[in-house]
Amino acid sequence: MEVKWGMKASEKIKGIVFAYDTNGEYDMVKELGVEWMRLNICFPWKDKMFGTLSEEYIAARQEIRDTHAKGFQVMPATPPLGGFTYDEEEGKTCWHEHFPEFVGKKGTEEFYENVRESMRFICEDLGEAAGIYWQCMNEIDIPVFSNDYPDDILADTARACAEGIRRGNPEARCGINISCYNENAVRIADLVYREGHSFYYMGVDQYFGSWQPGDAENWIGVLDALYERYRLPVLANEWGYSSAGELAEEMPDPALVPKGLPEVCYVKKWFHEAKGGHTPEVQADYFRRGHRIFAQHPHCLGSFM
């Protein structure tokens, strides 16, 4: 898919991620100058393809409609193959599939076609409540959302998501978001963005100074590298910096960390910090610098905090 684009700073996406529940805090978000919200949408049916809508889907759809009615543009994020949850009392993680068995065996054309049709349905069902931008799945390069599925299944499911969305709206602008810029992430992204893809942008999440070492200025190199590699506008699907939290003195023993649980979530401390530490003042300065970078970078589509 060839993309020709040019964008003024005032036209770029200024968004925020509400991955779970907005709690109706629309006025507070508007005070930030936010125009876009990223909201999750789940698989629609609980019994069969084009069957009975699940309660979870109905609730997610209503939240997107309510958010749009409040004057926001919504970027829907489609479901990954699944996700891990953590039971702290048991000290164990549990994997939850997001596509029911009736969608088909993963890796088969039946599965991919049902994914396409599911996404087409979602796109048409949301209608004008969904903005032109879509995020296909979430951070498919890390086990939290991919478990041990093969790379080709992850990549082809993401491609099928975009193809289905564009069946519902040929003008839709789709992309994925890798969890960070590293060798493993771009290896999988290369499969997603191979010839014949239906994507408009390349997306990436980075939390320099919190989840990764560095500071806001490290975004410049990531934006440059991803644009050079994929020749598509780059969206910062997630970014930010924590205003609180202690710094861990050492990494935990990998053997003790449950599968699918990030080390940060296990120890409940950060392994990185920007100069000045995790404070509201450092956070505010970090955001000022980050927003300036996204506004000025010629290949950046915008960002979601």
Give residue spans per PLM region.
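Aromatic- and acid-rich polysaccharide-binding/catalytic face
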Residues: 37, 76, 119, 130-132, ...
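Surface-exposed amphipathic alpha-helices with a cationic face
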Residues: 7-8, 30, 62-69, 158-171, ...
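Non-catalytic positions within long, well-ordered alpha-helices that form the structural scaffold/packing
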Residues: 29-33, 68, 127, 193-195, ...
